[in-house]
A protein has these predicted regions:
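Hydrophobic anchor at the beta1->P-loop junction of P-loop NTPases
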Residues: 8
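Hydrophobic positions on the alpha1 helix immediately C-terminal to the Walker A/P-loop
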Residues: 19
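NTP-dependent small-molecule kinase module
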Residues: 151-247
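P-loop (Walker A) phosphate-binding loop of NTP-binding proteins
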Residues: 11
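Conserved substrate/cofactor phosphate-moiety recognition/catalytic segment
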Residues: 25-67, 102
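A glycine- and Lys/Arg-enriched "phosphate-lid" helix/loop adjacent to the NTP-binding pocket
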Residues: 100-175
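Conserved nucleotide-sensing/catalytic segment adjacent to the nucleotide-binding pocket
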Residues: 49-89, 111-112
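Conserved lysine of the Walker
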Residues: 16
Length: 247
């Protein structure tokens, strides 16, 4: 089976996890690759501080170490899931390309990583793209949100590893996401300034945007299965995606 990889992108606090949980419920024949945050949190020093905390507390010291770890653990999780899954659609909570075009690039250009570290990091990414899985073939869903709103959401969820995140950092991430994805022909941009967690209509609108993008990208419609939104239960107002072979 030729699996379609769709990566959910966006700033910290934009709502990627919520968006992915909605997709999991409403999208047939799909599997999810979560961001390897638990792996990062489990990697601790003698003071029981994990690498994520250490990175946010001292970005200059830990930038290369953390980006190298992020690169390797993303590769591991993506390839493990693709190899074990029988699903046609694989949704990623961020991709390897996110680090290359946003996080690592920003750290390097802000002088948090030196040139040698930058080149060493990109050796991994370039090898993966060339010999394993080319990220240019992905579809990207860019969840775009005002950095101030992202910061409020981060404070609300109260993760200890994120206590050091400030508005300037989120504004920089927003800029790099924009430069990478706003004019990317493989990307769909979705405005997430308003909460969509409990808005069924907005959720279905977002899913239809993804469906339309996949239809445009697909060259062989004879082998492509269209996805439609269909009301399954009128009383409960629940909707699901069903598949039917395109003509």
């Amino acid at each position: 089976m030729n699996k379609k990889i769709i990566s959910i992108e966006g700033n910290i606090g934009v709502g990627k996890s919520t968006f992915i949980s909605i997709l999991k419920k409403k999208w047939p024949n799909c599997d999810i690759v979560s961001e390897p945050v638990e792996l990062w949190k489990d990697l601790t020093n003698d003071d029981n501080k994990n690498i994520l905390q250490m990175f946010y507390e001292d970005i200059n010291r830990w930038s290369y170490t953390f980006q190298n770890l992020a690169c390797i653990t993303r590769m591991m999780k993506i390839e493990d899931k693709i190899n074990e899954s029988n699903c046609e659609y694989i949704f990623l909570d961020r991709s390897l390309a996110t680090d290359k075009h946003v996080f690592e690039k920003m750290l390097f250009e802000n002088n948090n990583m030196n040139l040698i570290e930058h080149k060493m990091y990109n050796l991994w990414c370039d090898f993966y793209d060339k010999y394993v899985r080319n990220s240019k073939n992905y579809t990207y869903i860019y969840l775009k949100c005002d950095p101030n709103i992202c910061l409020n959401r981060i404070k609300k969820r109260g993760r200890s590893e994120e206590e050091s995140i400030n508005l300037k950092y989120l504004e920089d991430l927003n800029k790099y996401h924009d430069e990478w994805l706003l004019n990317n022909e493989n990307a769909i941009v979705i405005d997430c300034n308003e909460s969509f967690e409990d808005d069924e209509n907005k959720q279905l609108e977002f899913i239809n945007l993804i469906i339309n993008k996949l239809l445009v990208q697909n060259d062989n419609l004879d082998e492509f299965y269209k996805l439609k939104i269909n009301k399954e239960n009128e009383n409960d107002n629940q909707k699901k995606i069903i598949k039917e072979k395109s003509l």
